[in-house]
A protein has these predicted regions:
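Immediate post-signal-peptide N-terminus of mature secreted/exported proteins
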Residues: 19-83
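Non-membrane alpha-helical secondary structure
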Residues: 43, 47-53, 57, 87, ...
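Generic signature of mature, soluble extracytoplasmic domains
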Residues: 63-66, 70-111
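Extracytoplasmic electrostatic interaction patches
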Residues: 95-181
């Protein structure tokens, strides 16, 4: 029985002494990988085709308004507010490219994180300061991805909200103008 306890203690000591010195960094990389995965899923839920269709509709509506709206008539305040809100759709022209660029950045960062994790698990990095530097660089990269992903998500939600509330009003103006002129 004494030999079993001594053997178990030696085995536990051996496991603890041989554990990876970068366990904390490996855990941090795992968290970063989860964050990047969440950003990727968030982006995949954003419909760039829907945004493109909103922009096309904006162009059609505004073309009719510019052509048929009488400039010297008194513009009611509601129309002015709605038209200003609707301009936000026009500003979203770079949405699709922004989404695609961020997805490329995510793919690159996922590879970098996987490589860093492998290097840490295999103890291929000999210096803890170097490991900390690499981890800090990847943390910065992931934080930038999170900021841009949240901004794209917020912009998408705003666009959908504007389209849902303002587009019907603007379309009714277009319909009225088409009937009059």
């Amino acid at each position: 029985m004494g030999h079993t306890v001594l053997g178990t203690m030696l085995l536990a000591l051996l496991i603890v002494s041989c554990s990876n010195p970068y366990q904390k960094e490996i855990s941090a990389v795992t968290k970063l990988q989860q964050d990047v995965e969440e950003c990727e899923q968030l982006l995949k839920g954003l419909d760039a085709v829907q945004v493109r269709e909103m922009i096309d509709e904006y162009g059609k509506v505004m073309a009719v308004i510019k052509e048929k709206y009488i400039a010297d008539s008194t513009v009611d305040q509601r129309f002015g507010r709605m038209a200003n809100l609707y301009k936000g759709v026009k500003r979203s022209r770079g949405f699709e490219a922004g989404k695609e660029n961020l997805l490329k950045e995510i793919a690159f960062t996922k590879t970098q994180l996987e490589n860093l994790r492998d290097d840490l698990e295999n103890e291929d990095i000999n210096n803890s300061d170097t490991a900390a530097l690499y981890l800090q660089m990847e943390t910065t990269s992931v934080n930038e991805i999170k900021i841009v992903a949240e901004k794209l998500h917020s912009n998408f939600e705003t666009l959908v909200s504007v389209q849902d509330t303002v587009y019907p009003y603007m379309q009714s103006i277009v319909d009225s103008l088409n009937k009059i002129r």
